Curated annotation (Swiss-Prot):
It is a peripheral membrane protein. It holds the Pfam family ATP-synt_ab. The lineage of its organism: Bacteria, Bacillati, Bacillota, Bacilli, Lactobacillales. The gene is atpA. It comes from the Bacteria. PANTHER family: ATP SYNTHASE SUBUNIT ALPHA, MITOCHONDRIAL (PTHR48082:SF2). It comes from Latilactobacillus sakei subsp. sakei (strain 23K) (Lactobacillus sakei subsp. sakei). This is ATP synthase subunit alpha. Belongs to the ATPase alpha/beta chains family. GO terms for cellular component: plasma membrane; proton-transporting ATP synthase complex. Its EC number is 7.1.2.2. The keyword Metal-binding does not apply. The record marks 362 as: Required for activity.
Amino acid sequence: MSIKTEEISALIKQQLANYNEELAVEEVGTVTYVGDGIARAHGLENALSSELLEFSNGSYGVAQNLETNDVGIIILGEYENIREGDQVKRTGRIMEVPVGDALIGRVVNPLGQPVDGRGEIKTDKTRPIEKKAPGVMARQSVSEPLQTGLKAIDALVPIGRGQRELIIGDRKTGKTSVAIDTIINQKGQDMICIYVAIGQKESTVRTQVETLRRYGAMDYTIVVEAGPSQPAPLLYIAPYAGAAMGEEFMYNGKHVLIVYDDLSKQAAAYREISLLLRRPPGREAYPGDIFYLHSRLLERAAKLSDELGGGSMTALPIIETQAGDISAYIPTNVISITDGQIFLESDLFYSGTRPAIDAGSSVSRVGGAAQTKAMKKVSGTLRLDLSSYRELEAFTQFGSDLDAATQAKLNRGKRTVEVLKQPLHKPLPFEQQTVILYALTHGFIDDVPVDDIMRYESGLNDYLESNAKDLMDEIRQTTKLPDTDKLDAAIKAFTEGFVPEQAADDKDSDK
Protein backbone atom coordinates (compact mmCIF):
# COMPACT_ATOMS: atom_id res chain seq x y z
CA MET A 1 0.00 0.00 0.00
CA SER A 2 1.49 3.32 -1.07
CA ILE A 3 1.21 6.34 1.22
CA LYS A 4 0.07 9.46 -0.63
CA THR A 5 1.80 12.29 1.19
CA GLU A 6 -0.10 14.92 -0.81
CA GLU A 7 -3.47 13.66 0.47
CA ILE A 8 -2.26 13.47 4.08
CA SER A 9 -0.78 16.98 3.99
CA ALA A 10 -3.98 18.34 2.38
CA LEU A 11 -6.06 16.69 5.12
CA ILE A 12 -3.85 18.14 7.87
CA LYS A 13 -4.02 21.62 6.28
CA GLN A 14 -7.82 21.38 6.08
CA GLN A 15 -8.10 20.41 9.75
CA LEU A 16 -5.75 23.23 10.75
CA ALA A 17 -7.82 25.69 8.72
CA ASN A 18 -11.02 24.55 10.46
CA TYR A 19 -9.50 24.68 13.95
CA ASN A 20 -10.85 27.57 15.95
CA GLU A 21 -9.92 27.91 19.61
CA GLU A 22 -12.49 29.98 21.50
CA LEU A 23 -10.94 31.92 24.32
CA ALA A 24 -13.24 33.24 27.04
CA VAL A 25 -11.73 36.50 28.25
CA GLU A 26 -13.14 37.77 31.52
CA GLU A 27 -12.08 40.69 33.65
CA VAL A 28 -11.73 39.34 37.16
CA GLY A 29 -11.07 41.14 40.43
CA THR A 30 -10.37 40.09 44.01
CA VAL A 31 -12.52 40.88 47.05
CA THR A 32 -10.49 42.93 49.54
CA TYR A 33 -13.28 43.69 52.06
CA VAL A 34 -16.79 42.41 52.78
CA GLY A 35 -19.35 43.28 55.46
CA ASP A 36 -22.78 44.87 56.07
CA GLY A 37 -23.94 44.13 52.53
CA ILE A 38 -20.94 45.95 51.03
CA ALA A 39 -17.83 44.59 49.29
CA ARG A 40 -14.69 46.17 47.88
CA ALA A 41 -12.82 44.57 45.00
CA HIS A 42 -9.44 45.25 43.41
CA GLY A 43 -8.65 44.64 39.74
CA LEU A 44 -11.89 45.65 37.99
CA GLU A 45 -10.40 48.72 36.28
CA ASN A 46 -12.96 48.77 33.44
CA ALA A 47 -16.12 48.15 35.50
CA LEU A 48 -19.03 50.47 34.65
CA SER A 49 -21.28 52.31 37.07
CA SER A 50 -24.28 50.15 38.13
CA GLU A 51 -22.82 47.12 36.29
CA LEU A 52 -23.86 43.70 37.55
CA LEU A 53 -20.91 41.75 39.02
CA GLU A 54 -20.79 38.03 39.84
CA PHE A 55 -18.96 36.57 42.84
CA SER A 56 -17.31 33.15 42.74
CA ASN A 57 -20.03 31.65 45.00
CA GLY A 58 -22.79 32.65 42.54
CA SER A 59 -23.98 35.78 44.39
CA TYR A 60 -24.40 39.04 42.53
CA GLY A 61 -23.56 42.64 43.31
CA VAL A 62 -23.81 46.06 41.67
CA ALA A 63 -20.84 48.39 41.13
CA GLN A 64 -21.51 51.66 42.95
CA ASN A 65 -18.22 53.42 43.72
CA LEU A 66 -15.64 53.49 40.90
CA GLU A 67 -12.39 54.52 42.62
CA THR A 68 -8.75 54.58 41.48
CA ASN A 69 -7.79 51.21 42.95
CA ASP A 70 -11.06 49.73 44.21
CA VAL A 71 -14.67 49.23 43.19
CA GLY A 72 -17.34 49.63 45.90
CA ILE A 73 -20.02 46.95 45.42
CA ILE A 74 -23.46 46.53 47.01
CA ILE A 75 -24.25 42.84 47.43
CA LEU A 76 -27.69 41.64 46.35
CA GLY A 77 -28.83 39.11 48.89
CA GLU A 78 -26.88 37.26 51.56
CA TYR A 79 -23.22 38.18 51.92
CA GLU A 80 -22.14 35.75 54.67
CA ASN A 81 -20.64 33.26 52.17
CA ILE A 82 -18.42 35.85 50.48
CA ARG A 83 -14.84 36.01 51.83
CA GLU A 84 -11.80 38.20 51.32
CA GLY A 85 -9.75 36.82 48.43
CA ASP A 86 -12.81 35.51 46.53
CA GLN A 87 -12.98 36.28 42.83
CA VAL A 88 -15.53 38.67 41.37
CA LYS A 89 -16.04 39.13 37.63
CA ARG A 90 -17.78 41.58 35.33
CA THR A 91 -20.92 40.52 33.47
CA GLY A 92 -21.11 43.44 31.02
CA ARG A 93 -24.80 44.08 31.80
CA ILE A 94 -26.86 45.93 34.37
CA MET A 95 -29.27 44.32 36.79
CA GLU A 96 -32.55 43.02 35.35
CA VAL A 97 -35.71 41.59 36.88
CA PRO A 98 -38.27 39.20 35.37
CA VAL A 99 -41.42 40.92 34.08
CA GLY A 100 -44.70 39.98 32.43
CA ASP A 101 -48.13 38.51 33.15
CA ALA A 102 -46.64 35.54 35.03
CA LEU A 103 -45.88 37.81 38.00
CA ILE A 104 -49.51 38.90 38.50
CA GLY A 105 -50.94 37.46 41.70
CA ARG A 106 -47.50 36.65 43.12
CA VAL A 107 -45.35 37.96 45.98
CA VAL A 108 -41.72 38.40 44.93
CA ASN A 109 -38.52 39.84 46.38
CA PRO A 110 -36.68 42.76 44.67
CA LEU A 111 -34.77 40.25 42.50
CA GLY A 112 -38.07 38.94 41.09
CA GLN A 113 -37.78 35.61 42.94
CA PRO A 114 -41.04 34.23 44.41
CA VAL A 115 -41.38 34.29 48.21
CA ASP A 116 -45.00 33.12 48.48
CA GLY A 117 -44.29 29.38 48.31
CA ARG A 118 -46.38 28.91 45.15
CA GLY A 119 -43.68 27.59 42.84
CA GLU A 120 -41.41 29.24 40.30
CA ILE A 121 -42.45 32.07 38.00
CA LYS A 122 -42.28 31.01 34.36
CA THR A 123 -41.36 34.01 32.24
CA ASP A 124 -38.53 34.64 29.82
CA LYS A 125 -38.96 38.43 29.75
CA THR A 126 -36.65 40.68 31.75
CA ARG A 127 -36.16 44.44 32.07
CA PRO A 128 -33.31 46.51 33.53
CA ILE A 129 -34.25 48.03 36.91
CA GLU A 130 -32.79 51.40 35.90
CA LYS A 131 -34.28 53.07 32.83
CA LYS A 132 -34.37 56.60 31.56
CA ALA A 133 -37.77 58.21 32.18
CA PRO A 134 -39.94 59.07 29.13
CA GLY A 135 -39.09 62.47 27.62
CA VAL A 136 -41.41 65.43 27.14
CA MET A 137 -42.50 64.40 23.64
CA ALA A 138 -43.13 60.80 24.74
CA ARG A 139 -45.81 61.95 27.20
CA GLN A 140 -49.27 63.44 27.04
CA SER A 141 -51.15 65.41 29.65
CA VAL A 142 -53.12 63.57 32.33
CA SER A 143 -56.73 63.28 31.14
CA GLU A 144 -58.23 60.02 32.48
CA PRO A 145 -59.38 59.76 36.11
CA LEU A 146 -58.08 57.12 38.48
CA GLN A 147 -60.94 56.40 40.87
CA THR A 148 -59.72 55.61 44.38
CA GLY A 149 -63.22 54.85 45.68
CA LEU A 150 -62.60 57.27 48.57
CA LYS A 151 -64.98 60.26 48.51
CA ALA A 152 -62.52 62.59 50.24
CA ILE A 153 -59.86 61.95 47.58
CA ASP A 154 -61.99 61.69 44.43
CA ALA A 155 -63.83 64.91 45.35
CA LEU A 156 -61.08 67.07 46.91
CA VAL A 157 -57.76 65.78 45.53
CA PRO A 158 -58.62 63.86 42.34
CA ILE A 159 -55.92 61.66 40.81
CA GLY A 160 -55.42 61.07 37.08
CA ARG A 161 -53.80 58.14 35.30
CA GLY A 162 -50.10 58.90 34.90
CA GLN A 163 -49.94 61.22 37.92
CA ARG A 164 -47.56 61.03 40.92
CA GLU A 165 -49.56 61.72 44.11
CA LEU A 166 -47.73 61.59 47.43
CA ILE A 167 -49.43 60.12 50.52
CA ILE A 168 -47.78 61.70 53.55
CA GLY A 169 -48.40 61.60 57.29
CA ASP A 170 -47.20 60.34 60.66
CA ARG A 171 -47.03 56.63 61.44
CA LYS A 172 -50.35 54.93 62.11
CA THR A 173 -52.51 57.53 60.34
CA GLY A 174 -53.88 55.22 57.63
CA LYS A 175 -51.43 55.85 54.75
CA THR A 176 -51.20 52.20 53.72
CA SER A 177 -54.98 51.79 54.11
CA VAL A 178 -55.59 54.58 51.56
CA ALA A 179 -53.27 52.83 49.08
CA ILE A 180 -54.76 49.35 49.69
CA ASP A 181 -58.33 50.70 49.29
CA THR A 182 -57.28 52.33 46.02
CA ILE A 183 -55.92 48.98 44.77
CA ILE A 184 -59.14 47.19 45.82
CA ASN A 185 -61.20 49.79 43.91
CA GLN A 186 -59.36 49.01 40.63
CA LYS A 187 -61.28 45.74 40.25
CA GLY A 188 -62.82 45.69 36.78
CA GLN A 189 -61.06 48.95 35.82
CA ASP A 190 -58.49 47.32 33.45
CA MET A 191 -55.66 48.34 35.79
CA ILE A 192 -52.62 46.33 36.90
CA CYS A 193 -51.45 47.20 40.43
CA ILE A 194 -48.01 46.81 41.99
CA TYR A 195 -47.55 47.15 45.75
CA VAL A 196 -43.89 47.64 46.76
CA ALA A 197 -43.40 47.06 50.51
CA ILE A 198 -40.07 48.58 51.60
CA GLY A 199 -38.93 47.76 55.12
CA GLN A 200 -42.45 46.77 56.24
CA LYS A 201 -42.78 44.04 58.87
CA GLU A 202 -43.29 40.57 57.39
CA SER A 203 -46.50 40.15 59.42
CA THR A 204 -47.86 43.47 58.11
CA VAL A 205 -47.16 42.53 54.49
CA ARG A 206 -48.80 39.14 55.06
CA THR A 207 -51.91 40.91 56.38
CA GLN A 208 -52.03 43.24 53.35
CA VAL A 209 -51.65 40.32 50.91
CA GLU A 210 -54.47 38.43 52.67
CA THR A 211 -56.66 41.57 52.49
CA LEU A 212 -55.99 41.93 48.75
CA ARG A 213 -56.71 38.24 48.22
CA ARG A 214 -59.95 38.43 50.23
CA TYR A 215 -61.29 41.23 48.02
CA GLY A 216 -60.11 39.58 44.78
CA ALA A 217 -57.45 42.23 44.17
CA MET A 218 -54.52 39.78 43.87
CA ASP A 219 -55.99 38.79 40.47
CA TYR A 220 -54.44 41.98 39.05
CA THR A 221 -51.74 42.81 41.63
CA ILE A 222 -48.00 42.10 42.04
CA VAL A 223 -46.47 42.47 45.51
CA VAL A 224 -42.74 43.26 45.75
CA GLU A 225 -41.50 42.73 49.30
CA ALA A 226 -38.20 43.82 50.86
CA GLY A 227 -38.42 43.15 54.60
CA PRO A 228 -36.54 44.97 57.38
CA SER A 229 -34.39 41.88 58.03
CA GLN A 230 -33.03 41.94 54.47
CA PRO A 231 -29.77 43.72 53.56
CA ALA A 232 -30.02 47.46 52.82
CA PRO A 233 -29.15 47.00 49.09
CA LEU A 234 -32.39 45.04 48.56
CA LEU A 235 -34.46 47.80 50.22
CA TYR A 236 -32.68 50.32 47.99
CA ILE A 237 -33.42 48.53 44.70
CA ALA A 238 -36.99 47.39 45.54
CA PRO A 239 -38.81 50.48 44.12
CA TYR A 240 -36.76 50.35 40.90
CA ALA A 241 -37.60 46.65 40.48
CA GLY A 242 -41.31 47.46 40.92
CA ALA A 243 -41.06 50.31 38.39
CA ALA A 244 -39.42 47.97 35.83
CA MET A 245 -42.26 45.45 36.25
CA GLY A 246 -44.79 48.26 35.75
CA GLU A 247 -43.03 49.63 32.67
CA GLU A 248 -43.44 46.30 30.88
CA PHE A 249 -47.22 46.79 31.02
CA MET A 250 -47.13 50.56 30.44
CA TYR A 251 -45.10 50.28 27.22
CA ASN A 252 -47.59 47.65 26.01
CA GLY A 253 -50.46 50.14 26.22
CA LYS A 254 -51.81 49.05 29.61
CA HIS A 255 -52.55 51.08 32.74
CA VAL A 256 -50.57 50.53 35.93
CA LEU A 257 -50.92 51.75 39.52
CA ILE A 258 -47.76 51.43 41.65
CA VAL A 259 -47.57 52.07 45.39
CA TYR A 260 -44.18 52.64 47.09
CA ASP A 261 -44.68 51.93 50.82
CA ASP A 262 -42.63 53.74 51.90
CA LEU A 263 -39.82 55.81 50.37
CA SER A 264 -38.62 57.08 53.78
CA LYS A 265 -37.24 53.60 54.46
CA GLN A 266 -35.64 53.43 51.02
CA ALA A 267 -33.91 56.77 51.71
CA ALA A 268 -32.65 55.42 55.06
CA ALA A 269 -31.32 52.27 53.34
CA TYR A 270 -29.55 54.39 50.70
CA ARG A 271 -28.03 56.56 53.46
CA GLU A 272 -26.72 53.41 55.15
CA ILE A 273 -25.19 52.15 51.90
CA SER A 274 -23.61 55.53 51.12
CA LEU A 275 -22.05 55.86 54.58
CA LEU A 276 -20.65 52.31 54.36
CA LEU A 277 -19.19 53.18 50.95
CA ARG A 278 -17.62 56.27 52.61
CA ARG A 279 -19.42 58.78 50.43
CA PRO A 280 -19.43 62.33 51.87
CA PRO A 281 -22.55 62.87 54.04
CA GLY A 282 -24.74 65.96 53.66
CA ARG A 283 -27.84 67.22 55.45
CA GLU A 284 -29.15 64.71 58.04
CA ALA A 285 -26.23 62.45 56.92
CA TYR A 286 -27.96 61.75 53.57
CA PRO A 287 -25.64 61.72 50.52
CA GLY A 288 -25.70 64.58 48.02
CA ASP A 289 -27.69 62.63 45.39
CA ILE A 290 -30.63 61.73 47.65
CA PHE A 291 -32.96 63.98 45.60
CA TYR A 292 -31.92 62.18 42.40
CA LEU A 293 -32.64 58.84 44.12
CA HIS A 294 -36.37 59.68 44.22
CA SER A 295 -36.69 61.93 41.16
CA ARG A 296 -35.34 59.32 38.72
CA LEU A 297 -37.77 56.79 40.20
CA LEU A 298 -40.92 58.94 40.22
CA GLU A 299 -40.29 60.47 36.78
CA ARG A 300 -40.77 56.99 35.32
CA ALA A 301 -44.49 57.32 36.08
CA ALA A 302 -46.17 58.87 33.03
CA LYS A 303 -49.10 58.95 30.64
CA LEU A 304 -47.51 57.92 27.34
CA SER A 305 -48.39 59.51 24.02
CA ASP A 306 -50.76 57.69 21.66
CA GLU A 307 -47.81 56.91 19.34
CA LEU A 308 -46.26 54.86 22.17
CA GLY A 309 -49.53 53.06 22.90
CA GLY A 310 -51.17 55.47 25.36
CA GLY A 311 -50.32 53.36 28.42
CA SER A 312 -49.86 54.92 31.85
CA MET A 313 -48.17 54.34 35.18
CA THR A 314 -49.62 56.16 38.20
CA ALA A 315 -47.37 56.36 41.27
CA LEU A 316 -48.54 56.67 44.87
CA PRO A 317 -45.35 57.12 46.91
CA ILE A 318 -45.75 57.09 50.70
CA ILE A 319 -43.61 59.17 53.07
CA GLU A 320 -43.66 58.97 56.86
CA THR A 321 -43.31 62.24 58.79
CA GLN A 322 -42.22 62.87 62.37
CA ALA A 323 -44.78 64.78 64.49
CA GLY A 324 -46.52 66.09 61.35
CA ASP A 325 -43.42 67.94 60.11
CA ILE A 326 -43.80 68.05 56.32
CA SER A 327 -40.95 70.59 56.05
CA ALA A 328 -38.25 67.98 56.84
CA TYR A 329 -35.63 67.03 54.24
CA ILE A 330 -37.07 63.91 52.57
CA PRO A 331 -40.75 65.06 52.70
CA THR A 332 -39.94 68.41 51.00
CA ASN A 333 -37.85 66.61 48.37
CA VAL A 334 -40.67 64.24 47.41
CA ILE A 335 -43.35 66.97 47.62
CA SER A 336 -41.36 68.98 45.05
CA ILE A 337 -41.06 65.95 42.72
CA THR A 338 -44.70 64.81 42.82
CA ASP A 339 -47.87 66.33 41.33
CA GLY A 340 -49.57 66.85 44.67
CA GLN A 341 -49.92 65.33 48.11
CA ILE A 342 -52.56 63.79 50.36
CA PHE A 343 -51.72 64.82 53.92
CA LEU A 344 -53.08 62.56 56.66
CA GLU A 345 -53.28 64.21 60.08
CA SER A 346 -52.96 62.41 63.42
CA ASP A 347 -55.51 64.62 65.23
CA LEU A 348 -58.17 63.91 62.60
CA PHE A 349 -57.38 60.20 62.69
CA TYR A 350 -57.70 59.93 66.47
CA SER A 351 -60.91 62.00 66.47
CA GLY A 352 -62.54 59.36 64.25
CA THR A 353 -62.30 61.13 60.87
CA ARG A 354 -61.10 58.37 58.56
CA PRO A 355 -59.58 58.66 56.04
CA ALA A 356 -57.90 61.45 58.06
CA ILE A 357 -57.29 63.75 55.08
CA ASP A 358 -56.40 67.37 55.88
CA ALA A 359 -58.19 69.22 53.05
CA GLY A 360 -56.18 72.41 53.64
CA SER A 361 -52.73 70.82 53.17
CA SER A 362 -53.75 68.28 50.51
CA VAL A 363 -53.65 69.24 46.84
CA SER A 364 -53.68 67.65 43.39
CA ARG A 365 -51.86 69.75 40.80
CA VAL A 366 -52.95 67.92 37.64
CA GLY A 367 -55.77 65.57 38.66
CA GLY A 368 -58.46 68.26 38.31
CA ALA A 369 -58.12 68.01 34.53
CA ALA A 370 -58.95 64.31 34.76
CA GLN A 371 -61.92 64.68 37.11
CA THR A 372 -65.25 63.60 35.62
CA LYS A 373 -67.83 66.30 34.83
CA ALA A 374 -70.32 64.90 37.33
CA MET A 375 -67.79 64.88 40.18
CA LYS A 376 -66.53 68.35 39.24
CA LYS A 377 -70.08 69.72 39.51
CA VAL A 378 -70.98 68.16 42.85
CA SER A 379 -67.62 68.82 44.52
CA GLY A 380 -67.11 72.38 43.30
CA THR A 381 -67.79 74.14 46.63
CA LEU A 382 -66.82 71.25 48.88
CA ARG A 383 -63.28 72.38 49.72
CA LEU A 384 -64.49 75.94 50.42
CA ASP A 385 -67.33 74.67 52.63
CA LEU A 386 -64.92 72.48 54.56
CA SER A 387 -62.29 75.18 55.13
CA SER A 388 -64.90 77.78 56.19
CA TYR A 389 -66.38 75.19 58.58
CA ARG A 390 -62.96 74.60 60.18
CA GLU A 391 -62.55 78.37 60.71
CA LEU A 392 -66.06 78.78 62.16
CA GLU A 393 -65.60 75.74 64.38
CA ALA A 394 -62.51 77.31 65.95
CA PHE A 395 -64.34 80.65 66.29
CA THR A 396 -67.39 79.15 68.03
CA GLN A 397 -65.22 77.91 70.88
CA PHE A 398 -65.04 81.52 72.12
CA GLY A 399 -68.78 82.27 72.03
CA SER A 400 -72.19 80.71 71.48
CA ASP A 401 -74.24 83.60 69.99
CA LEU A 402 -74.51 82.69 66.31
CA ASP A 403 -76.74 84.09 63.59
CA ALA A 404 -78.83 81.79 61.41
CA ALA A 405 -76.43 81.90 58.42
CA THR A 406 -73.43 80.92 60.57
CA GLN A 407 -75.39 78.13 62.24
CA ALA A 408 -76.43 76.83 58.80
CA LYS A 409 -72.78 76.78 57.68
CA LEU A 410 -71.78 74.90 60.82
CA ASN A 411 -74.56 72.35 60.29
CA ARG A 412 -73.56 71.84 56.64
CA GLY A 413 -69.89 71.54 57.67
CA LYS A 414 -70.62 68.82 60.25
CA ARG A 415 -72.52 66.84 57.65
CA THR A 416 -69.76 67.35 55.07
CA VAL A 417 -67.18 65.89 57.48
CA GLU A 418 -69.50 62.96 58.20
CA VAL A 419 -70.21 62.27 54.50
CA LEU A 420 -66.48 62.19 53.71
CA LYS A 421 -65.87 59.50 56.35
CA GLN A 422 -65.60 55.98 55.00
CA PRO A 423 -65.19 52.50 56.53
CA LEU A 424 -61.96 50.57 55.91
CA HIS A 425 -61.79 48.52 52.68
CA LYS A 426 -65.18 49.79 51.50
CA PRO A 427 -64.40 51.91 48.41
CA LEU A 428 -67.51 53.38 46.74
CA PRO A 429 -68.29 53.23 43.00
CA PHE A 430 -68.07 56.59 41.24
CA GLU A 431 -71.84 56.95 40.67
CA GLN A 432 -72.65 56.34 44.35
CA GLN A 433 -70.08 58.95 45.40
CA THR A 434 -71.62 61.44 42.97
CA VAL A 435 -75.16 60.94 44.27
CA ILE A 436 -74.36 61.32 47.99
CA LEU A 437 -72.22 64.43 47.33
CA TYR A 438 -75.04 65.86 45.19
CA ALA A 439 -77.49 65.27 48.04
CA LEU A 440 -75.06 66.98 50.44
CA THR A 441 -74.33 70.09 48.35
CA HIS A 442 -78.00 70.57 47.42
CA GLY A 443 -79.23 70.59 51.01
CA PHE A 444 -81.08 67.26 51.09
CA ILE A 445 -79.06 66.12 54.12
CA ASP A 446 -79.30 69.36 56.13
CA ASP A 447 -82.09 67.97 58.33
CA VAL A 448 -80.67 64.45 58.69
CA PRO A 449 -79.09 63.92 62.15
CA VAL A 450 -75.28 63.71 61.95
CA ASP A 451 -75.24 60.26 63.60
CA ASP A 452 -77.56 58.92 60.89
CA ILE A 453 -75.54 60.14 57.87
CA MET A 454 -73.84 56.79 57.14
CA ARG A 455 -77.17 54.94 57.40
CA TYR A 456 -78.77 57.56 55.15
CA GLU A 457 -75.99 57.17 52.57
CA SER A 458 -76.27 53.39 52.48
CA GLY A 459 -80.07 53.56 52.23
CA LEU A 460 -79.99 56.20 49.48
CA ASN A 461 -77.66 54.11 47.32
CA ASP A 462 -79.82 51.00 47.76
CA TYR A 463 -82.99 53.00 47.01
CA LEU A 464 -81.59 54.56 43.81
CA GLU A 465 -80.18 51.24 42.56
CA SER A 466 -83.68 49.74 42.99
CA ASN A 467 -86.00 52.62 42.06
CA ALA A 468 -83.92 54.89 39.82
CA LYS A 469 -81.50 52.47 38.17
CA ASP A 470 -81.68 54.37 34.87
CA LEU A 471 -80.26 57.48 36.58
CA MET A 472 -77.40 55.50 38.18
CA ASP A 473 -76.63 53.78 34.86
CA GLU A 474 -76.56 57.16 33.11
CA ILE A 475 -74.03 58.57 35.59
CA ARG A 476 -71.95 55.39 35.32
CA GLN A 477 -71.88 55.37 31.51
CA THR A 478 -71.70 59.09 30.63
CA THR A 479 -69.80 60.31 33.75
CA LYS A 480 -72.17 63.32 33.67
CA LEU A 481 -75.04 64.34 35.93
CA PRO A 482 -78.42 63.14 34.62
CA ASP A 483 -81.61 65.22 34.46
CA THR A 484 -81.41 67.08 37.80
CA ASP A 485 -85.22 67.26 38.15
CA LYS A 486 -85.46 63.46 38.09
CA LEU A 487 -82.49 63.10 40.45
CA ASP A 488 -83.93 65.71 42.85
CA ALA A 489 -87.29 63.92 42.85
CA ALA A 490 -85.70 60.52 43.56
CA ILE A 491 -83.50 61.85 46.41
CA LYS A 492 -86.41 63.85 47.85
CA ALA A 493 -88.66 60.78 47.82
CA PHE A 494 -86.08 58.77 49.76
CA THR A 495 -85.29 61.61 52.21
CA GLU A 496 -88.96 62.10 53.06
CA GLY A 497 -89.32 58.41 53.82
CA PHE A 498 -86.06 58.18 55.79
CA VAL A 499 -86.63 57.65 59.52
CA PRO A 500 -83.76 58.74 61.82
CA GLU A 501 -82.61 56.08 64.27
CA GLN A 502 -83.78 58.02 67.35
CA ALA A 503 -87.26 58.48 65.90
CA ALA A 504 -87.40 54.78 65.00
CA ASP A 505 -86.42 53.86 68.56
CA ASP A 506 -89.12 56.18 69.97
CA LYS A 507 -91.77 54.51 67.76
CA ASP A 508 -90.68 51.08 68.94
CA SER A 509 -90.86 52.15 72.59
CA ASP A 510 -94.38 53.59 72.06
CA LYS A 511 -95.54 50.21 70.83
